[in-house]
């Protein structure tokens, strides 16, 4: 028997409940999220502007950082305004198309960030382990190629999710205990098998774990090269050049790890803890990345002070 209309097959809208169990304090939870959103916007925009306008920062490492800033600006803007709408104005309803759109952009920018972090790890590996080859390997053409690969792989991993969800019937199920839209959050509501969705999701996670493995291997090689240097002063200087990148990786991976860990093994943990950790996963990296690079990278710090505060260094 044919489906009567698309609305019966795909419910017209969903309800994002926010953080279940903490509804009474939603309005107060919104303030720290608003604060970190402002920090993410101002910090990433400032660093992106500085890299774009300062000729001395037109180097591979800073091009990668500019890509990271663009991704962080996009990721935070794709998630936090909707969260604030739920927390402050009780705007919980989102259309089916709106859900798919937000889900697409959240996963797309998350995958892109993972790839850019791999590129930044490769940049540090070449700079420390193969310094004489640095300018020959990491040319502007190679950086453009990395950016293209990041976009194409993200599309390859995320576009199928949209079509995997479009094929599912939801039978009127529309309540989602979350603050933003993600693939399995809606797939679980389907009144049909989601085995294909789960298998594709596991494949995507495997690719992201491969990114993590590449980052770890590059840093093992970096540490080996650093501790082969003749003096402690040279070792500390080399380690300092990697400090910002390691901080960014920890900001990206730590909330994701705890969110994944609690979902897999924390069955007795209250649901609001799961949702809160998932929120940190999309909020913390865009907020901390500009702070980490602004504080730890002397060249960026001095350039920001000179441009925005008219100080001489």
Curated annotation (Swiss-Prot):
UniProt-listed Gene3D superfamilies: Rhodopsin 7-helix transmembrane proteins
UniProt source species: Homo sapiens (Human)
A GO cellular component entry from the record: plasma membrane
Primary location class: membrane
Entry keywords, A to Z: Cell membrane, G-protein coupled receptor, Glycoprotein, Membrane, Olfaction, Receptor, Sensory transduction, Transducer, Transmembrane, Transmembrane helix
Alphabetized GO MF terms: G protein-coupled receptor activity; olfactory receptor activity
Protein name, UniProt field: Olfactory receptor 52E6
SUPFAM superfamilies: Family A G protein-coupled receptor-like (SSF81321)
